[in-house]
Curated annotation (Swiss-Prot):
Compartments in which it is found: Secreted; Bacterial flagellum
Note: Individual Salmonella serotypes usually alternate between the production of 2 antigenic forms of flagella, termed phase 1 and phase 2, each specified by separate structural genes.
Protein name: Flagellin
Record gene name: fliC
InterPro entries per the UniProt record, alphabetical: Flagellin, Flagellin_C, Flagellin_C_sub2, Flagellin_N
Keywords: Bacterial flagellum, Secreted
Function: Flagellin is the subunit protein which polymerizes to form the filaments of bacterial flagella.
Pfam families: Flagellin_C, Flagellin_N, FliC-like_3rd
Length: 505
C-alpha cells in the first residue's frame, strides 16, 4: 500500500464506519425513547402505511363503541318514558273497569273521567317533552341511525315511533260521555217535564198523560175518556142512563095501566097492614080508602121507603078497570147490575192505562216537553228525537243535565269497548318497548365485538410499529461499543500519516 499524506484512507474508512454506528445508535435510542419501531416512514414505509390504517380502524371502532353506548342511552331514555306511559295506561284501564260498573253515580263517573283525562294529558306531556341531547324521541316517527363501525354503512337503526294519545287510538277516550236519552231519563233529570203517550185501539186514538195518567182522545180538542160502567168499553160519556121503572114514577101513570090496576086490585082485596108481592117487590097496604081500591102502599128500596098512591079507581062488577098510580120517588134499574136505584144515571169511571190495555190498545210514540221544547219518543221510550235527530243526555262542567243532538254527542260520546281500546294501546307500547329492549341487547353485543376487534387490532398494530426493547437494547449496546471502538481506531488512523514523516528524517 502506498504511503501518502494527502489522503488518509484509513481515517476515511473509520469515519464512515463511525457514522454508521452513530446512525444505528441514534435509531436505537429513538426507538427506545419512543417505544416505537417505526417513528417515521423511513423506518418501515410499508409497515408505517399498514400501521396507519390500523390506527384509523382502531380510532373509528373506538368511537363506534362510544356511539353504540349512546344508542343504548337513547333506547334507555325512550324505554324509561314508555314505562311511565305504560303506568298511566294501566291506571286508565283500572279506572275504566271501575267506570263500567253499574253502581256508579253520575258524580262518580265524572270523577273517574276527570282522572282519566289527567292521565291522558300526562301521556301527551311525556311524549312531547322526552328528548335525548335535544332530539325528541317520542313526538314523531323517526329512524335514528347509530354508526357502530369504522366504515360507511356500518349502522344500527333505532326505530322510534310517535307515542301519544292520538297514535295510541285514545283520542277522545271517554267513559262518561253523553248517553242516549230515554223517557225515564227526561223525567228524572229535568224539572216540569210534561207530555203524553199515544195509544191506538182499533181506529180510536188516545193519549195518556205521563204525569197524571189521565186518558183523553188523541185530537186537536181532546175529550176525556171513561170506561162504560155497563160493558167496560171506552167512551167519552161520563155516565150511562139507568132504566126508569114504570111502577115507580113521580108522575101519575095513565089511567088503566097494568101496574095501577094490579096495585088497586091488591088494595081492594086486602086491608090495611096486609102485604103482597108484585113484580118481585113486597108491598104493604098503608091506607085503604073505601072499597074501590084507592089507597097507598109502600115498600123499602135501598133502605128508603117508597110510597105508591092509587087513585081514580074505575071498577067493574068484579075487577078494577082503571086507576092512576103515582110514586113518592122515581126508581130506576141500574145498567150495571139491574138493581133498583134512585139515580137516573150510573157514573162512568175515568179511564186509566190499565183500561186501555184491557181494550187491547197498542202503545205508539210519545210527545215529551222539556224546557219548552217538544221531543218525540219511540214506543218503547228508549229513543228521543228532535227534528229527526237522536237526543243524548250530557252533563255540563257544573254537573247540570242538558240535552244535545247526535251531532254534538258524536264528539263527546263514550268510547265503545273502552277496555279493548286500552288493551290495544298497551300492546302498542309493549311492542315498542320490546323493540327498544332488543336493540339495547344488540348494542351490548356490538360493543363487546367492537372491544374485541379494537384489542386485536391494537395487538396487530403493536407487532408492526412497537419497538422490541430486547432487540433495540442489544442494538444500542452494539452501536455504543462500535462508537467507542471507532473513536479509538479513528484516533490511531489519524496518526498513520505521521509515519510518512519518519521517511523524511
Amino acid at each position: 500500500m502506498a504511503q501518502v499524506i494527502n489522503t488518509n484512507s484509513l481515517s476515511l474508512l473509520t469515519q464512515n464506519n463511525l457514522n454508521k454506528s452513530q446512525s444505528s445508535l441514534s435509531s436505537a435510542i429513538e426507538r427506545l425513547s419512543s417505544g416505537l419501531r417505526i417513528n417515521s416512514a423511513k423506518d418501515d414505509a410499508a409497515g408505517q402505511a399498514i400501521a396507519n390504517r390500523f390506527t384509523s380502524n382502531i380510532k373509528g371502532l373506538t368511537q363506534a363503541s362510544r356511539n353504540a353506548n349512546d344508542g343504548i342511552s337513547i333506547a334507555q331514555t325512550t324505554e324509561g318514558a314508555l314505562n311511565e306511559i305504560n303506568n298511566n295506561l294501566q291506571r286508565v284501564r283500572e279506572l275504566s273497569v271501575q267506570a263500567t260498573n253499574g253502581t256508579n253515580s253520575d258524580s262518580d263517573l265524572k270523577s273517574i273521567q276527570d282522572e282519566i283525562q289527567q292521565r291522558l294529558e300526562e301521556i301527551d306531556r311525556v311524549s312531547n317533552q322526552t328528548q335525548f341531547n335535544g332530539v325528541k324521541v317520542l313526538s314523531q316517527d323517526n329512524q335514528m341511525k347509530i354508526q357502530v363501525g369504522a366504515n360507511d354503512g356500518e349502522t344500527i337503526t333505532i326505530d322510534l315511533q310517535k307515542i301519544d294519545v292520538k297514535s295510541l287510538g285514545l283520542d277522545g277516550f271517554n267513559v262518561n260521555g253523553p248517553k242516549e236519552a230515554t223517557v225515564g231519563d227526561l223525567k228524572s233529570s229535568f224539572k216540569n217535564v210534561t207530555g203524553y203517550d199515544t195509544y191506538a185501539a182499533g181506529a180510536d186514538k188516545y193519549r195518556v198523560d205521563i204525569n197524571s195518567g189521565a186518558v183523553v182522545t188523541d185530537a186537536a180538542a181532546p175529550d176525556k175518556v171513561y170506561v162504560n160502567a155497563a160493558n167496560g168499553q171506552l167512551t167519552t160519556d161520563d155516565a150511562e142512563n139507568n132504566t126508569a121503572v114504570d111502577l115507580f114514577k113521580t108522575t101519575k101513570s095513565t089511567a088503566g095501566t097494568a101496574e095501577a090496576k094490579a096495585i088497586a086490585g091488591a088494595i081492594k082485596g086486602g086491608k090495611e097492614g096486609d102485604t103482597f108481592d108484585y113484580k118481585g117487590v113486597t108491598f104493604t097496604i098503608d091506607t085503604k080508602t073505601g072499597d074501590g081500591g084507592n089507597g097507598k102502599v109502600s115498600t123499602t128500596i135501598n133502605g128508603e121507603k117508597v110510597t105508591l098512591t092509587v087513585a081514580d079507581i074505575a071498577t067493574g062488577a068484579t075487577n078494577v078497570n082503571a086507576a092512576t098510580l103515582q110514586s113518592s120517588k122515581n126508581v130506576y134499574t141500574s145498567v150495571v147490575n139491574g138493581q133498583f136505584t134512585f139515580d137516573d144515571k150510573t157514573k162512568n169511571e175515568s179511564a186509566k192505562l190499565s183500561d186501555l190495555e184491557a181494550n187491547n190498545a197498542v202503545k205508539g210514540e210519545s210527545k215529551i216537553t222539556v224546557n219548552g221544547a217538544e221531543y218525540t219518543a219511540n214506543a218503547t221510550g228508549d229513543k228521543i228525537t228532535l227534528a229527526g235527530k237522536t237526543m243524548f243526555i250530557d252533563k255540563t262542567a257544573s254537573g247540570v243535565s242538558t240535552l244535545i243532538n247526535e251531532d254534538a254527542a258524536a264528539a263527546k260520546k263514550s268510547t265503545a269497548n273502552p277496555l279493548a281500546s286500552i288493551d290495544s294501546a298497551l300492546s302498542k307500547v309493549d311492542a315498542v318497548r320490546s323493540s327498544l329492549g332488543a336493540i339495547q341487547n344488540r348494542f351490548d353485543s356490538a360493543i363487546t365485538n367492537l372491544g374485541n376487534t379494537v384489542t386485536n387490532l391494537n395487538s396487530a398494530r403493536s407487532r408492526i410499529e412497537d419497538a422490541d426493547y430486547a432487540t433495540e437494547v442489544s442494538n444500542m449496546s452494539k452501536a455504543q461499543i462500535l462508537q467507542q471502538a471507532g473513536t479509538s481506531v479513528l484516533a490511531q488512523a489519524n496518526q498513520v500519516p505521521q509515519n510518512v514523516l519518519s521517511l523524511l528524517r
